[in-house]
From Swiss-Prot:
The keyword Transcription regulation applies. Gene3D superfamilies: E6 early regulatory protein. GO terms for cellular component: host cell cytoplasm; host cell nucleus. Plays a major role in the induction and maintenance of cellular transformation. E6 associates with host UBE3A/E6-AP ubiquitin-protein ligase and modulates its activity. Protects host keratinocytes from apoptosis by mediating the degradation of host BAK1. May also inhibit host immune response. GO terms for biological process: DNA-templated transcription; regulation of DNA-templated transcription; symbiont-mediated perturbation of host apoptosis; symbiont-mediated perturbation of host ubiquitin-like protein modification; symbiont-mediated suppression of host innate immune response; symbiont-mediated suppression of host type I interferon-mediated signaling pathway. This is Protein E6. It comes from Human papillomavirus type 1 (Human papillomavirus type 1a). Belongs to the papillomaviridae E6 protein family. The gene is E6. One of its GO terms (molecular function) is DNA binding. The keyword Zinc applies. It is found in: Host cytoplasm; Host nucleus.
C-alpha cells in the first residue's frame, strides 16, 4: 500500500508539477490557498484532507477561525507546565503542542519559551495547545 500524501510538497511531487502550480482549495471556505499559505501549511505540519478523491488544505484565515472556535467551544482546562509534565509523565519537549491561535506545531524553541515565560498549556478537544512565538509576538 502506498504512503498517503499528506503535504503539499508530496502532492506536487506525486503529480510531477511545480509546487507553485498546485491548486489547493481550503477545506472550509473553498478558496484556493496562496503560495505563501501552501508553504505555511507544510511548515505548520498540517495534513491534507482527502474526500471523494479530492484534496483540501486550510487557508490561514480559516485556520485561525477554526482554532478560535475550537477554543471557545471545546476548551477543557489549563495547566502549568510542571502539572502537564506530571500528568503525562513526560517532559514538555516530548509532548506535542500546537498553537492555540494558528494551529502550528510548536518547535522545541517555542516550547522552551512557554516554559521560560511561565505560560499555561491548554487542553482543547483533548489536544494540548499554547501560543507559538509569532502569535505571542503579535499578541493575537
Amino acid at each position: 500500500m502506498a504512503t498517503p500524501i499528506r503535504t503539499v510538497r508530496q502532492l506536487s511531487e506525486s503529480l510531477c508539477i511545480p509546487y507553485i502550480d498546485v491548486l489547493l482549495p481550503c477545506n472550509f471556505c473553498n478558496y484556493f490557498l496562496s503560495n505563501a499559505e501552501k508553504l505555511l501549511f507544510d511548515h505548520f505540519d498540517l495534513h491534507l484532507v482527502w474526500r471523494d478523491n479530492l484534496v483540501f488544505g486550510c487557508c490561514q484565515g480559516c485556520a485561525r477561525t477554526v482554532s478560535l472556535l475550537e477554543f471557545v467551544l471545546y476548551y477543557q482546562e489549563s495547566y502549568e507546565v510542571p502539572e502537564i509534565e506530571e500528568i503525562l509523565d513526560r517532559p514538555l519537549l516530548q509532548i506535542e503542542l500546537r498553537c492555540v491561535t494558528c494551529i502550528k506545531k510548536l518547535s522545541v524553541a517555542e516550547k522552551l519559551e512557554v516554559v521560560s515565560n511561565g505560560e499555561r498549556v491548554h487542553r482543547v478537544r483533548n489536544r494540548l495547545k499554547a501560543k507559538c512565538s509569532l502569535c505571542r509576538l503579535y499578541a493575537i
